[in-house]
Amino acid sequence: MDIIGGQHLRQMWDDLADVYGHKTALICESSGGVVNRYSYLELNQEINRTANLFYTLGIRKGDKVALHLDNCPEFIFCWFGLAKIGAIMVPINARLLREESAWILQNSQACLLVTSAQFYPMYQQIQQEDATQLRHICLTDVALPADDGVSSFTQLKNQQPATLCYAPPLSTDDTAEILFTSGTTSRPKGVVITHYNLRFAGYYSAWQCALRDDDVYLTVMPAFHIDCQCTAAMAAFSAGATFVLVEKYSARAFWGQAQKYRATITECIPMMIRTLMVQPPSANDRQHRLREVMFYLNLSEQEKDAFCERFGVRLLTSYGMTETIVGIIGDRPGDKRRWPSIGRAGFCYEAEIRDDHNRPLPAGEIGEICIKGVPGKTIFKEYFLNPKATAKVLEADGWLHTGDTGYCDEEGFFYFVDRRCNMIKRGGENVSCVELENIIATHPKIQDIVVVGIKDSIRDEAIKAFVVLNEGETLSEEEFFRFCEQNMAKFKVPSYLEIRKDLPRNCSGKIIRKNLK
């Protein structure tokens, strides 16, 4: 079923400007409280100016341009400005350091970079020490270093006309973006995303939360992440709604921002929910207009109930990954919700559970969650320049192996168990990290938790727990292990405990387990 009909991203923005004109499209709030607003007409003009800027710098269809930016209007300008001229955006996680950023530059073949003064010293070093194809850098800040090959993004953009100067033929099959995965267990892979992928994501995600043009979708998720782009931004723009992009998440500021912008939809990850719950209760906790909170794994039922009760919201569960573009399994608008189910397969998708021999399993049996879509349309096209990795996860007929374990019930509701790589093998038993983390998270002194497997010469793997305590709390090993023994089977009780100030996370809030031993 083709729901796009040849409408690439350039056509989308021209149509949105015509239809919605002076209606507010984008609101950006910086960490310093500076707010920028753009109507659909104004935003399309800024996108055109940015496209013209890239053209004057020699960027043509098929060229790759890297963005290393925090949430800001310039990210949106660049994203769609590049798409309008058929160039390809390569967003870089703003938390990455020199080695990882250089690796993405090298492996994406990016020839131009847009970044800020905050990250510029790192890229100076990369240009001096690493072999990349980078030939120019645009800085979004006003003050510029006196270096060759560096220019002001804002000054160049403001010199451009508001109408597009270069409009090569485009197809919805053209690549719009190469988004490198977070790489929590290995080197990141470049997920190739087409114009069709992004257009479909907008319509699908708008359907998922029943988005209307009078909605306000607020997100604090990073713009370089698939959730912000495909679940939030593309959904809001496709519906003609208002998209609010906050530069940085703050638990203290979040509800005030939701109230100020009269947000009706937002998205949360477990880290956000836990930090919001430790804020002092306020009479304003329920003074908001949120209709849905899009939610991504993983949370205990006790935590979910406490959050919904305190803030008067309901969670709309959505399950997906960079390769699926959107939440391909999730709660449906107007449908029943069955916690802790992650929902049912969305329209245009099939889902099933398979065993280790790639055979479908009946309801109730645990296996790998597999998704069927159309590569380059409803799921990613391929891994950039990595056919071996593509073939490992994507079958020729469109079945995608997620690497996650789960099961489904007789009514087609799916249940997430864990990432396959997060299953601990202990003395012949398979132990789910997520299961243990959900149990341990109910301890009143614990704010954050992750468990990992470490080598054990006798039992294959031992279990180690890393915990972050609530402010002012202390926790003895005796108290911790006694709690575990009272709440889980003996073979699941961790052997080791380490108390830390924080846990290493990537841009989407996922624990970087490879950094924990």
From Swiss-Prot:
Pathway: Amine and polyamine metabolism; carnitine metabolism
Biological process, per Gene Ontology: carnitine metabolic process; fatty acid metabolic process
NCBIfam families listed in its UniProt record: PRK08008.1
Domain of life: Bacteria
Enzyme class per UniProt: ligase
Protein's name according to its UniProt entry: Crotonobetaine/carnitine--CoA ligase
Entries under CDD domains matching the protein: FACL_DitJ_like (cd05934)
EC assignment: 6.2.1.48
Protein role: Catalyzes the transfer of CoA to carnitine, generating the initial carnitinyl-CoA needed for the CaiB reaction cycle. Also has activity toward crotonobetaine and gamma-butyrobetaine.
Reaction equation(s) it catalyzes: 4-(trimethylamino)butanoate + ATP + CoA = 4-(trimethylamino)butanoyl-CoA + AMP + diphosphate; crotonobetaine + ATP + CoA = crotonobetainyl-CoA + AMP + diphosphate; (R)-carnitine + ATP + CoA = (R)-carnitinyl-CoA + AMP + diphosphate
Keywords of this entry: Ligase
Molecular function GO labels: carnitine-CoA ligase activity; crotonobetaine-CoA ligase activity; medium-chain fatty acid-CoA ligase activity
Family, per entry: Belongs to the ATP-dependent AMP-binding enzyme family.
Gene3D superfamilies per the UniProt record, alphabetical: 3.30.300.30, N-terminal domain of ligase-like
